[in-house]
């Protein structure tokens, strides 16, 4: 279960970083904005790994011997992307007009990694529904907190959250490889 908690923490970093940005750049009430961010990001971060898990489970029969390598490879790719994004100079997005459509798009964008990571749940000895719920709850908590942190600290912490999440995913990928060998 510790693997799922670490996975949840790592996957929540995208939503956490975006929530920090939302808090820093948006004039809305932090409580209302925090609740919206928690709801959107938490729900999508819970659903996407479940979809990835179900897709991976369907392929597991003919991929059984390669499953740990595929899962580790996907996690390593996600980790590399997150680490790269933590150093990349991003384009400032105008999120001052935060509509439901914008929140929906942000929730989808931040949960694509969770879709791929859901495949890793097929090779971990965990209950998928509990794992996905835990990922969603942890993401919701981090998203809510991120809005308040963004109000206080501004955008400085955004890239640090991405880097930490990427490093944790890389460690999980290495553990999966070590167990498979």
Curated annotation (Swiss-Prot):
Annotated compartments: Cell inner membrane
Membrane-spanning segments: 4-24, 31-51, 59-79, 102-122, 129-149, 161-181
For this record, the Gene Ontology CC terms, alphabetical, are: plasma membrane
From which domain of life does this come?
A: Bacteria
Instruction: Cite a single GO MF annotation.
Output: manganese ion transmembrane transporter activity
Looking up Pfam families in the UniProt record yields: Mntp
Where mainly located?
membrane
Q: Which UniProt keywords apply?
A: Cell inner membrane, Cell membrane, Ion transport, Manganese, Membrane, Transmembrane, Transmembrane helix, Transport
Give the membrane topology.
Answer: Multi-pass membrane protein
Q: Which family does it belong to?
A: Belongs to the MntP (TC 9.B.29) family.
Provide the function of this protein. Answer: Probably functions as a manganese efflux pump.
Q: What name has this protein been given in UniProt? A: Putative manganese efflux pump MntP
Native source species: Saccharophagus degradans (strain 2-40 / ATCC 43961 / DSM 17024)
Task: Give the gene that encodes this protein.
Answer: mntP
């Amino acid at each position: 279960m510790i693997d799922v908690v670490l996975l949840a923490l790592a996957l929540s970093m995208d939503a956490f970083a975006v929530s920090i940005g939302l808090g820093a750049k948006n004039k809305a009430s932090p409580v209302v904005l925090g609740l919206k961010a928690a709801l959107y990001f938490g729900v999508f971060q819970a659903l996407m790994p479940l979809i990835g898990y179900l897709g991976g489970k369907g392929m597991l029969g003919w991929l059984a011997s390669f499953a740990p390598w595929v899962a580790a490879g996907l996690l390593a790719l996600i980790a590399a992307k997150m680490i790269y994004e933590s150093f990349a100079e991003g384009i400032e997005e105008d999120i001052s007009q935060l509509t439901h459509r914008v929140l929906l798009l942000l929730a989808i964008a931040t949960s694509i990694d969770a879709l791929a990571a859901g495949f890793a749940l097929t090779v971990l000895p965990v209950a998928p529904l509990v794992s996905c719920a835990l990922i969603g709850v942890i993401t919701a908590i981090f998203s809510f907190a991120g809005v308040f942190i963004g109000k206080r600290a501004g955008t400085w912490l955004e890239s640090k959250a991405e880097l930490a999440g990427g490093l944790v995913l890389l460690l999980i990928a290495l553990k999966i490889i070590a167990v498979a060998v």
